[in-house]
Curated annotation (Swiss-Prot):
Gene it is expressed from: RPS11
N6-acetyllysine: residues bearing it: 38, 45, 58
Membrane-spanning intervals of the chain: none
Classification lineage: Eukaryota, Metazoa, Chordata, Craniata, Vertebrata
Modified residues (Citrulline): 22
Entry keyword annotation includes Transcription: no
Top-rank taxon: Eukaryota
Family matches, as Pfam families: Ribosomal_S17, Ribosomal_S17_N
Major place of residence: cytoplasm
Species this protein is from: Homo sapiens (Human)
Name recorded for this polypeptide: Small ribosomal subunit protein uS17
SUPFAM superfamilies reported for this sequence: Nucleic acid-binding proteins
Stored PROSITE patterns: RIBOSOMAL_S17
List of residues that carry Phosphoserine: 67, 110
Chain positions with N-acetylalanine modification: 2
Length: 158
């Protein structure tokens, strides 16, 4: 990632102090700033890009101020047209007692996608975790991405 300072406000992680007196120490070279990251627990590994990357995202579960609590769900990526937000589709079966059969149903969910997950494509299976409301429609954060298999456009139950 080239330059993170593209916004009007200075982009920085709030927990990292950047105003160290380097003149007194005699250091003149550009050194890499320390980076804040955390282990979110629940058996999910922190991505390498979250540890070594330079992106700033306050809504990222690994480098931001968001805690994962509540439900852990999975779904298939259907749309990627928003910035740092994707739409996933969750398929399920609903039982109809009169006909003694099941019908297919689905729900779409808006989910925050951290920049540490770089190569996410439509059709990939993502695992998401519940967090505090991040916007009007977003209440979940991507925790893991599994690449799509060869078959597409079929009903998948999670």
């Amino acid at each position: 990632m080239a330059d993170i300072q593209t916004e009007r406000a200075y982009q920085k992680q709030p927990t990292i102090f950047q105003n160290k007196k380097r003149v007194l120490l005699g250091e003149t070279g550009k050194e890499k700033l320390p980076r804040y990251y955390k282990n979110i627990g629940l058996g999910f590994k922190t991505p390498k890009e979250a540890i070594e990357g330079t992106y700033i995202d306050k809504k990222c579960p690994f480098t931001g101020n968001v805690s994962i609590r509540g439900r852990i769900l999975s779904g298939v990526v259907t749309k990627m047209k928003m910035q740092r937000t994707i739409v996933i589709r969750r398929d399920y079966l609903h039982y109809i007692r009169k006909y003694n059969r099941f019908e297919k149903r689905h729900k779409n969910m808006s989910v925050h996608l951290s920049p540490c997950f770089r190569d996410v494509q439509i059709g990939d299976i993502v695992t998401v975790g519940e967090c505090r409301p991040l916007s009007k429609t977003v209440r979940f954060n991507v925790l893991k991405v599994t690449k799509a298999a060869g078959t597409k456009k079929q009903f998948q139950k999670f």
